[in-house]
Structures are given as structure tokens and as C-alpha cells.
């Protein structure tokens, strides 16, 4: 996100500001979405509905991202593997519950779950999302292997990343199905109409993990999101640093 490659080899110092603006928009947006998803899971788990509780929670979560970006990167780097394994274990448990309840057939064959959305629209969204994640996977694979001894090391990393991306898509779809009805009821009680409640239910899978695993599921969501959003906070800060340096010659010292 600090645009080193584009700054040195493509766009130059001034031109790299465009890349910084794109990264800032992308990372801040992803950070906001992740914060809302985590916050909704916590609100659901504890039954908090008051406006002041929402304000305190979301401000508190944002402060945690800042604190972890400044002081917690080493801890997260050491615990990252455990977080990922724990998350996949919980997702696997949800899939087991679906199979045990005899719902696997319905979970794999149901139609579009949001009222008013046509099959073609859903397919277009799926293709668009796949394009976006493929680009991110390529970026991360290139970033993780930039110090590799040979170019062929990129192949297994990119392959494993793509495989687990597909597995995550499948698990995510099943998890969304598992808690869809309860999540729709929850968001309907918050004042959403049928379409809005269905959309919110699909985009907040953390509620399904809370339904399946209770406090354990919530804890794993928090830890997993902590790693992702800390990385996004650092990436956003790097992009802002490059933006100020490329446009104004100001070197931010954070």
C-alpha cells in the first residue's frame, strides 16, 4: 500500500499519489465494513440495542485497531496461525451442524435469498467479487514472495491461497444459510424492511458463528478480525504517508 513499486518504477513520486488515494479509499472502506460486521456480532451476542451502547462499542473497536496497529503487530504475527486454524474449526463445526440437521441439500441448492434480486444480478455480483479477490490474492502472493530465493516459490503460495479462498467461499455461503432466518428476524426488529434485513443478514456472518458456537465463536471472530483490521490500519497509514510525501514533501513520522 505504500506504493513503493509504482513510485520507483512506474508513476514516479507525484504520480504515486493516485495509487495512495485508491488504497486509502479501499482500505478505509474495508476497515469500516469489518468494524460494522464485528460490532453487529457483538451487539447480537450481548443483546445491546441502545444508541449509546452502539456508539461506545464502535468507537471502542476503532480505538482497538489503532492501538494494535501501533503496539500489537508482533503479538498478532505470532498468533496469526492459531487464529486462522481456530476460525476454520468453527466454520467446519457450523457445516457439521448443517449436515447433522439434514439441511445440507437445501443449503447447497437454495436460490437467491434477498427479495427482489434476480439470478443474473446475483451471478454478476459473484463474478465481480471473484475478480476483486483474485486481484488481492495476486497482490498478496507477490508481496509475500518478494524475498523468495526463486520465482517458482510463488506457485505453491498462490495455489494454496486460491484453494483456501474457494473453501472459504463455500464455508461462508453455508454459514450464511445456517443463521439466515435468525439474523433476518434480528435486523427486522431493528427497523429494516424485508430486503434490507435479508441483505444485512447475508453481510453479517458473525451472527451465524455466534448462534453456532456462542462465546467461543464470538471470541474467534474478534481475534480473526483483529489481525485483518490491524493490517488494514497499517496499510492505510502507509498510503496516507506516501500521499503527504508525494504531494507536499511532508514526511509523517508515525
What is the meaning of each model-derived region?
Residues 171-230, 245-246:
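TM-loop-TM module centered on a large, flexible mid-protein loop between adjacent transmembrane helices
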Residues 37-48, 62-83, 140-150, 242-245:
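Membrane-water interface regions at transmembrane-helix termini and the short interhelical loops
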Residues 20-23, 47-71, 85-94, 122-141, ...:
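Transmembrane alpha-helical segments of multi-pass small-molecule transport proteins
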Residues 14-25, 58, 116-127, 206-224:
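Select transmembrane alpha-helical segments in multipass membrane proteins
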Residues 69, 86-113, 126, 130-133, ...:
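Hydrophobic alpha-helical segments and their helix-loop junctions in multi-pass secondary transporters
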Residues 4-8, 36-54, 230-254:
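Helix-loop-helix connectors at the membrane interface of multi-pass transporters/channels
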Residues 5-9, 66-67, 126-158, 177-178, ...:
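Helix-loop junctions at the membrane interface of multi-pass solute transporters
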Residues 1-19, 42-47, 73, 157, ...:
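Flexible loop linkers connecting adjacent transmembrane helices
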Amino acid at each position: 500500500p505504500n506504493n513503493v513499486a509504482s513510485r520507483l518504477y512506474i508513476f514516479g513520486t507525484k504520480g504515486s499519489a493516485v495509487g495512495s488515494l485508491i488504497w486509502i479509499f479501499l482500505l478505509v472502506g474495508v476497515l469500516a465494513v469489518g468494524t460494522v460486521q464485528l460490532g453487529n456480532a457483538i451487539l447480537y451476542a450481548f443483546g445491546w440495542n441502545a444508541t449509546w451502547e452502539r456508539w461506545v462499542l464502535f468507537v471502542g473497536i476503532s480505538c482497538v485497531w489503532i492501538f494494535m496497529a501501533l503496539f500489537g503487530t508482533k503479538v498478532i504475527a505470532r498468533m496469526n496461525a492459531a487464529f486462522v486454524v481456530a476460525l476454520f474449526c468453527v466454520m467446519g463445526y457450523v457445516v457439521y451442524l448443517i449436515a447433522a440437521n439434514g439441511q445440507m441439500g437445501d443449503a447447497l441448492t437454495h436460490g437467491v435469498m434477498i427479495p427482489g434480486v434476480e439470478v443474473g444480478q446475483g451471478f454478476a455480483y459473484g463474478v465481480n467479487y471473484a475478480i476483486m479477490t483474485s486481484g488481492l490474492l495476486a497482490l498478496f502472493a507477490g508481496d509475500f514472495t518478494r524475498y523468495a530465493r526463486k520465482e517458482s516459490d510463488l506457485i505453491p503460495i498462490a495455489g494454496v491461497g486460491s484453494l483456501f479462498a474457494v473453501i472459504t467461499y463455500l464455508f461462508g455461503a453455508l454459514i450464511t444459510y445456517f443463521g439466515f432466518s435468525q439474523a433476518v428476524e434480528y435486523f427486522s426488529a431493528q427497523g429494516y424492511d424485508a430486503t434490507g434485513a435479508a441483505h444485512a443478514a447475508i453481510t453479517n456472518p458473525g451472527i451465524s458463528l455466534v448462534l453456532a458456537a456462542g462465546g467461543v465463536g464470538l471470541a474467534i471472530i474478534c481475534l480473526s478480525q483483529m489481525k485483518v483490521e490491524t493490517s488494514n490500519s497499517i496499510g492505510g497509514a502507509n498510503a496516507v504517508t506516501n500521499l503527504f510525501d508525494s504531494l507536499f514533501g511532508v514526511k509523517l513520522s508515525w
